[in-house]
């Protein structure tokens, strides 16, 4: 299936070229493995603009945003 993926902040270099990815898994955990992103480094994940857990299933055409842990203060 084809996904649009955008990684943010420190994960930005792991965004697929052009943001498009041919995905061969079923869920967010599979996607993180395919992108070589450790699960601990993907703290906030959106699919089609909705926050999801790492066990969320993905479907063809989904737009995925992956954010690392953030801090501030």
Where is each model-derived feature located?
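Ubiquitin-like/PB1-type beta-grasp interaction modules and other compact soluble beta-rich domains
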Residues: 1-72
């Amino acid at each position: 299936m084809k996904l649009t993926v955008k990684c943010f902040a420190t994960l930005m270099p792991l965004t697929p070229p052009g943001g498009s990815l041919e995905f061969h898994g079923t869920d967010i955990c599979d996607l993180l493995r395919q992108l070589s992103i450790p699960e601990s480094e993907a703290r906030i994940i959106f699919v089609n603009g909705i926050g999801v857990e790492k066990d969320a299933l993905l479907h063809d055409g989904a737009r995925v945003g992956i954010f690392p842990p953030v801090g501030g203060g």
